Amino acid sequence: MKKTVVCTFYNEEYILPWFLKHNREVFDHGVMIDYHSTDRSREIIKELCPTWDIVMSRNFDFQADKVDREIMDVENQFDGWKMCLNATELLVGDYSILGDQPWQFLVPSVFMVDCDKERLVTHDLPLYEQKTFGFTFDTQQNFLERRARSIHSIPVQ
């Protein structure tokens, strides 16, 4: 089954090259929802992922309930596996278990932190190879507390 990522963005030209280079290898398709960016974000997406869709958000502010509804509406336009990620998130894992049956999996989050402001990074290397300090949440904690992400192949209501 096809895997589609949905991502909202606003002026993310700094982080988008890492997000796109990484996730284009994981997902078959992407839908990038532009919250009226004024930087080069759209051009970067077109350059690095020319087959991905870029849509202008129907929202003019970033209210959680409106964002969630818009993402659900976009996800429902596609068959297969769907996942929403922020531009700061990189999906890492083995997804060979994803089959053709409707299902949902919760994927725990990993947060990358680097307190060394002097460390220079380049878009030519994966970010996780340059920022090597991170942490995960205890696997026994509630998924909502851990900010887990859902990859699913079922329609959302």
PLM features per residue range, with description:
Residues 2-21, 36:
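Active-site beta-to-alpha loop of glycosyltransferases that engages the nucleotide-sugar donor
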Residues 3-4, 18, 40-85, 93:
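Active-site-proximal specificity loops/subdomain of glycosyltransferases
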Residues 24:
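Gly/Ala-rich phosphate-binding loop of Rossmann-like dinucleotide-binding domains
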Residues 28-36, 56-57:
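Short beta-strand/loop segment that forms part of the nucleotide-sugar
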Residues 30-31, 82, 108:
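Hydrophobic residues within beta-strands of alpha/beta enzymes
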Residues 35, 85-87:
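Active-site acidic Asp-centered loop
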Residues 64-76, 91-157:
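Catalytic-site signature of metal-activated, phosphate-bearing donor transferases
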